[in-house]
């Protein structure tokens, strides 16, 4: 785990830094999606049995329509503030660890990949769960592929692991390796509502921390209820009443 930074990063330094280098990798965590969502986050083991739902697509779609679509719906204010952040002429790559990618005007990498982990059991063609959801329209039916095979969720649909190609996409967004030497592709990492116990997040932080110099910064926007999980902690900036407020604050400061 990366060491804590004792010295507070002045806001004017951060703002000048972003305006000068015009780049950032923005990592979105589960807290930004779950904020203010009044839906039960966990269902009973009987309702959420992975093996059962993989074998029985109807149970998967029932769970998906009743829980996942609601749980991971982004609040309008959060979506607007994050999109505004990406429109500040920054060369940005977003790593979205949530279930649905709703951001535009930027390159989005989704490590969880849950919305792309449906496939035909016959020809193994991949399908997007969100698109299938809209086709389903709450009907209790089995979706068919053009080849005639049934479309079913895979184990990866439930976020049990990250496939290696996703690891490589994430690493390539932040790091470059040439002739055995690793360098950074971005000057700024911005974490918004992330889970620092996630192995991928920890690896990113440790690697970035080992390579960065005075021209590289890490920014954390987190709820004050989660500040004990923040590795890079800035009392003046990182703690807010909510994540949306934190992003809005950054946007306001950048626009000054």
Predicted regions and their residues:
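Conserved catalytic alpha/beta core of Sir2/sirtuin-type deacylases, generalized to analogous enzyme cores
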Residues: 1-256
């Amino acid at each position: 785990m990366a060491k804590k930074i004792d010295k507070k990063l002045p806001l004017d330094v951060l703002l000048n830094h972003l305006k000068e280098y015009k780049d950032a990798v923005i990592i979105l965590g589960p807290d930004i999606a779950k904020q203010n969502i009044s839906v039960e986050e966990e269902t009973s083991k009987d309702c959420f049995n992975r093996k059962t739902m993989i074998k029985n697509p109807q149970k998967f779609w029932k769970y998906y329509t009743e829980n996942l679509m609601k749980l991971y719906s982004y609040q309008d204010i959060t979506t607007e503030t994050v999109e505004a952040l990406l429109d500040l002429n920054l060369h940005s790559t977003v790593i979205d660890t949530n279930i649905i990618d709703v951001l535009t005007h930027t390159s989005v990498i989704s490590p969880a990949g849950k919305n792309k982990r449906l496939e035909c059991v016959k020809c193994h063609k991949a399908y997007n769960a969100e698109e299938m959801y809209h086709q389903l329209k709450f009907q209790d039916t089995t979706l068919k592929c053009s080849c005639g095979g049934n479309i079913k969720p895979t184990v990866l649909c439930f976020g049990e692991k990250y496939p290696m190609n996703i690891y490589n996409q994430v690493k390539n967004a932040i790091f470059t390796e040439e002739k055995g030497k690793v360098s950074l592709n971005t000057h700024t990492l911005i974490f918004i509502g992330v889970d620092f116990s996630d192995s991928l997040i920890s690896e990113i932080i440790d690697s970035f921390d080992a390579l960065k110099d005075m021209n590289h910064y890490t920014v954390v926007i987190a709820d004050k209820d989660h500040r004990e999980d923040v590795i890079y902690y800035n009392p003046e900036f990182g703690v807010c009443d909510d994540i949306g407020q934190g992003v809005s604050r950054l946007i306001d400061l950048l626009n000054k």
